[in-house]
């Protein structure tokens, strides 16, 4: 079994276009592992320092390594967000209407993983969701009214925080990057915000009461509010 896993790992690494990423995936795969300096890698891999520097910058932008002046190059925990964020924002720069398509992907992802995700939440997690609802309602009832955008983002991400799936988490986090990029966080109709947060409050109460089928139904219903808005 171990030999099969090793062979599969090697086969996947061979498909990477970057010699640097191939090296990291096979020799420095654990988060915190140090990657040798570029001059050392240049000799070992037979590539110029210039070429390796280019590959390092790509790896850094993809969030696959950490680069600091004194500590050098280190592997980091795998995170899907940086890669998908760059592609998504580029797509929106070309055509802002793509936000609706990505929003549909996000809605189906949330609905598909909702029951599994919220079943894993701790008592403290659930209390945090309630606190976010209370903070948002306080902003909406204040003078002047404030848009509870951070609470909105934190609530949705918070419902899925215990999922051990970096692709789902990255996809959902990228949605909020896109939401802010198209400036849906800047202005909202007050009635829309009231309706959204009424749904949020009921969803959270369903989570806390373990009425997950009802909570899922409300989640799906509430997604229609943004469809109507955009």
What are the residue ranges of the model-derived segments?
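Short linear motifs at protein or domain termini
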Residues: 1-105
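Short alpha-helical transmembrane interface motifs in multi-pass membrane proteins
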Residues: 95-96, 183-186
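Solvent-exposed loop and edge beta-strand segments that line ligand/cofactor-binding
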Residues: 188, 192
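Short, locally clustered residues in the helix-turn-helix/winged-helix DNA-binding domain
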Residues: 25-29, 118, 208
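Conserved amphipathic alpha-helical segments that form helical-bundle/coiled-coil interaction surfaces
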Residues: 105-184, 196-200, 205, 214-225, ...
């Amino acid at each position: 079994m171990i030999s099969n896993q090793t062979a599969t790992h090697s086969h996947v690494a061979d498909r990477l276009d970057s010699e640097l990423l191939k090296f990291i995936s096979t020799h420095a795969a654990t988060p915190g592992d140090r990657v040798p300096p570029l001059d050392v890698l240049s000799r070992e891999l037979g590539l110029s320092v210039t070429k390796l520097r280019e590959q390092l910058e790509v790896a850094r932008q993809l969030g696959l390594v950490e680069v600091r002046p004194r500590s050098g190059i280190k592997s980091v925990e795998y995170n899907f967000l940086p890669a998908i964020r760059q592609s998504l924002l580029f797509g929106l720069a070309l055509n802002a209407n793509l936000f609706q398509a990505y929003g549909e992907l996000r809605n189906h992802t949330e609905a598909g993983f909702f029951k599994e995700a919220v079943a894993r939440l701790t008592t403290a997690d659930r209390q945090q969701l309630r606190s976010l609802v209370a903070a948002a309602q306080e902003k909406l009832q204040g003078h002047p009214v404030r848009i509870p955008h951070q609470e909105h983002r934190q609530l949705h991400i918070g419902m899925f925080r215990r999922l051990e799936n970096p692709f789902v988490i990255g996809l959902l986090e990228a949605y909020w990057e896109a939401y802010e990029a198209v400036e849906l966080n800047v202005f909202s109709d007050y009635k829309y915000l009231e309706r959204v947060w009424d749904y949020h409050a009921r969803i959270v109460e369903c989570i806390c009461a373990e009425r997950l089928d009802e909570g899922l139904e409300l989640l799906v219903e509430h997604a229609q509010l943004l469809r109507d808005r955009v």
